[in-house]
């Protein structure tokens, strides 16, 4: 019940609203008219490729919701309805779980090489449909097309990587304590996995979970965000085309509370993997306790970006800009607080503002766009709440600070100065295009300020000093640290946080362990 209430609140918060002001402004009307033409052509291209799916996937079959209900998938830039997809609930989820459970035994018995070949084919199909997937992603999520293309490649990289790692799931032989014994450790797939994924990276967050799960021999029930199900469904369609068997991947979307509760209550689901808010992650963790499921959680962040006075300013500007404004600030590893040493604060602020001014806000389908809309009206209202809180406590708006003239859920790239630790911008994740600048005096002050949070996902530091880079990296209470770099995620490195930013790791060889169980075998009386 608590889980259902939490997910209902999250769904209510994320409800899409169309701004009355934008519907009456001439610029808003022109924007929607222009984007409608682009969106129509893009959707037709996706449809022609056979990748526009609106039904759920259960046991290899595309099925409607059992009660016939649907939900709208909207373009966040225009409010237009892109498609109506099946609104599924507990019954459909239970059937998806049953399908995954029955398929698990045959899929897990395949050789690692056989699973690897199927995954490799899936990777190749994703790459061959790179443009269509990117178009779909831009339409339903809003990110610029160039970022969407990068995400397709990034998402596919997990499939490729884990296709190879499938053949490297090694056990152990332990030296015995008695001469007539042999001690072995096997690694075996955990079973059916429930994967709950977010809207900000609608492809990569699926492949980062489903790739290792399938490589290990697990089967999966995916619950994508109701805001971005089309990308997930297209990816699942390509998985079927690649020869991944019916039932190995199932996709259900719609009624988040019902789907979540069905996954948690099922004894056949042996693992939950989730990327999303800390609040919902805590509910999933608590709900998993009743059936003692294995849990992986990649939760919210509050990333500090520390710029020391010995940093290369150009490198720091470029890295901070990338760390902050990618996907319009809607990533869990976004620089949420930019801490700048007092000696270079004014110089950095001036150069940073100039760089932010160069960001082009607009239609994600246009080549020149570098900043798309926020996902919905609720996201804009959250940003406004944080800005109002900061200015009421003494912060000053150095750039932006208001809704964009394009209307809808567009927000101006914003820089806020003199932010202090009593402000929401310092304490919580804004998840929008707002860069708070915070001055600090010493290295010790920077470390203390950076660690003054319950979150611990990503952190960034900019310095020319190698000793300082080691000291600060080791002192920061974060799972990921970028040194003189603002984009650090890769399929070959472990991704995950500490403290209340999550449990477990995704990507890399360490990500495989999240989907495996250890089995110890003692063979006796061998003399």
UniProtKB/Swiss-Prot annotation:
Protein's pathway: Amino-acid degradation; 4-aminobutanoate degradation
One GO cellular component term: mitochondrial matrix
Coiled-coil spans in chain: none
Class of the enzyme per the UniProt entry, highest EC level: oxidoreductase
GO BP, sorted A to Z: gamma-aminobutyric acid catabolic process
Recorded catalytic activity of this chain's protein: succinate semialdehyde + NAD(+) + H2O = succinate + NADH + 2 H(+)
Gene3D superfamilies: Aldehyde Dehydrogenase, Chain A, domain 1 (3.40.605.10), Aldehyde Dehydrogenase, Chain A, domain 2 (3.40.309.10)
The keyword Mitochondrion appears for this protein: yes
Feature type site, description Transition state stabilizer: 200
Active site: 298, 332
Entry's EC annotation: 1.2.1.24
UniProt-listed SUPFAM superfamilies: ALDH-like (SSF53720)
Bridged cysteine pairs (disulfide): 332-334
Regulation: Redox-regulated. Inhibited under oxydizing conditions.
Binding site for substrate: 208, 326, 332, 489
Binding site for NAD(+): 208, 223-226, 276-281
Family the entry assigns: Belongs to the aldehyde dehydrogenase family.
Quaternary assembly: Homotetramer.
PANTHER family: SUCCINATE-SEMIALDEHYDE DEHYDROGENASE, MITOCHONDRIAL
Identification of the protein by name: Succinate-semialdehyde dehydrogenase, mitochondrial
Protein's organism: Oryza sativa subsp. japonica (Rice)
Upper taxonomic lineage: Eukaryota, Viridiplantae, Streptophyta, Embryophyta, Tracheophyta
Gene (name only): ALDH5F1
